[in-house]
Amino acid sequence: MLKELRNIGIIAHIDAGKTTTTERILYYTGLTHKMGETHDGDSIMDFLPWEKERGITVASAATRCFWKGNTINIIDTPGHVDFTAEVERSLRILDGAVVIFCGKGGVEPQSETVWRQADKYQIPRIAYVNKMDAVGADFFRVIEQIKQRLGSNPLVISLPVFKEECFSGIIDLIKMKYYTFAGKLGNDIAEESIPSEYTETAEEWRSVLVEKLAETDETLLDLYYNNEEIDAGLLSRVIRTNTVSGNMVPVCCGSSYRNIGVQLLLDSIVDYLPSPLDLPGSKAVIMETTETINIMPDSQDAFSALVFKIINDRHVGRLAFARIYSGKLKAGTVVFNSSKNKRERVGRLLRIHAEHREEINEVAAGDIVAIIGLKDIGTGDTLCSENFPLLLETIDFPQPVIQIAIEPKNQAGLDKISEALNRISAEDPTFKISYNKETGQVLLAGMGELHLEIVAERLAREFKLDFNTGQPQVAYRETIGKSAEQVTRYVKQTGGKGQFAHVVLRLEPGEGFEFINRISQGSIPREYIPAVESGIKQALEEGVLKGYPVVNVKATLLDGSFHEVDSSEMAFRTAAFLATRECLKKAHPRMLEPVMRLEIVSPEEYTGNIINNITNRRGKLESLEMENHTQIIRGCVPLAELFGYSTVLRSLTQGRAGFSMEFSHYEERHLAS
């Protein structure tokens, strides 16, 4: 039943305890009989070799478990900024999220990033303050940070209890009960009266909870004003309504590593996060009419699904992970890839549990599945019924910001490296490949040094390739500053059939890449239009200034003509390519460089030195914030100025400061700078 289905993601800053929490969830729901640990390298969700060795999540991993009659599809995502695209693609297809915060670290830089991503997709969420056993953990400070830094409306539903300064249990503010988790693995849950020393605090926070909820529900408001007893079931229903609407974020606490509170978190997931039926549906465009409609999760409707992840499995080949939005999908049936205008036959359907697979025959609306057998498939593609072709909203990914050059140790290895890189780039939309024609080097572009380090490791270990790598470089981009038009007639006459294509093209500044066809009355036959778009895209792969990819361009095909005999797809592709190159020269080409958002945590006495250094690196200071005698400095600095910054910061602060950075935006860089 869809009502009992939850599609959720676990998202957080690195080391907040995402994978540890997921491992406990799998154990308590009976899916596993042993708790894996990231520090021991035996966690079920981090099953890739480089994840086990580093103790971090690199790729999002899916699993499915059951709790109190509900089915929970879980996607555990990376916390490292280099792999933020994994969070992006996961949130696009999920209905809810658990955002984990470290009880000591609170709202950290990547916490803010994943929160913004969840806001972008309007994902209802629960906050879980983890690591309450850590020295320096402060539950109420984290609540305040969630409110102030994230602009959220936190609703505290549980309180931590400490005995002799040790985290010992949790007060449930809805039931007004105290819970302890005994036994080595926290299996023995005891429900007790609230300890006397916590009674006053619990009653205060219970009043805050009821007051906030009463503002949104008349029945609750009447009971509250009349001092009548309030049923826990009513509170839960009102909390659910406010969570699903995004009005409030329930906050609970625990220590996953110490096995305290995870069962209560599971209760909150099924009680407060939405089922597919609770949400307004997913937008789609009907291809025939370009009308925008809402797709509801009805298994009786026409089939539609969005592919959100591709992996190459050594046992079964290419696996396409998809969220089913409507209808049903059966193994062996033919589907229509509306993003590529192609028919595809589905081979087998699999349920995924980390690296383990379970074959199924059918999947229905609202669920998540892995598909084997799709040949020409990419992340963000829509699969649908050929009788009702439509396009679901795709997934936006950030541009790569850093690149390295690699060279095979012998020429024979170049083809093997190219094949391996193409397989990796099919899996990872933020990983790009290009070739330097002058040096013969292969350039790999990604979101950060760790991202590219993992790619290089995969090439060596998974594909058994031998190569040299260069130093990291900035992945610059080019764009245009004004509109330009070009008329190009491509005519080539040889002994036999000639080539002819005539295009009138306009380029102007835009967002991303957009192609518009303004051809009317058949001056260019419809079958040649895709070739024109292909030629434009090919020309944008290398800019006219320094050969970097060109971004943020809107291309409009205004007019043209053809020859009945000599015109061909190749002729129009070539004409569009040449026209685009000429347009780029006339449209005030400009260089763009990636700018990073920097956060530095330092003792106060080094603030002046750090700010001066940021300014000297062409940086812009955004904010200063004091917290527990520690200065938090935030600003934006071009990536080109940040190579080796960790060494510089150590020198400036005698090793007492730390920093993190994430991609912010691209901005113009003058060639003289």
Curated annotation (Swiss-Prot):
It comes from Syntrophomonas wolfei subsp. wolfei (strain DSM 2245B / Goettingen). GO terms for biological process: ribosome disassembly. The keyword Cytoplasm applies. Residues 3-277 form the tr-type G domain. Keywords: Cytoplasm, Elongation factor, GTP-binding, Nucleotide-binding, Protein biosynthesis. It comes from the Bacteria. PANTHER family: RIBOSOME-RELEASING FACTOR 2, MITOCHONDRIAL, TRANSLATION ELONGATION FACTOR G-RELATED. SUPFAM superfamilies: EF-G C-terminal domain-like, P-loop containing nucleoside triphosphate hydrolases, Ribosomal protein S5 domain 2-like, Translation proteins. InterPro entries: EF-G-like_DII (IPR053905), EFG_II (IPR041095), EFG_III (IPR009022), EFG_III/V (IPR035647), EFG_IV (IPR047872), EFG_V (IPR035649), EFG_V-like (IPR000640), G_TR_CS (IPR031157). This is Elongation factor G 1. CDD domains: EF-G, EFG_III, EFG_mtEFG1_IV, EFG_mtEFG_C, EFG_mtEFG_II. The lineage of its organism: Bacteria, Bacillati, Bacillota, Clostridia, Eubacteriales. GO terms for cellular component: cytoplasm.
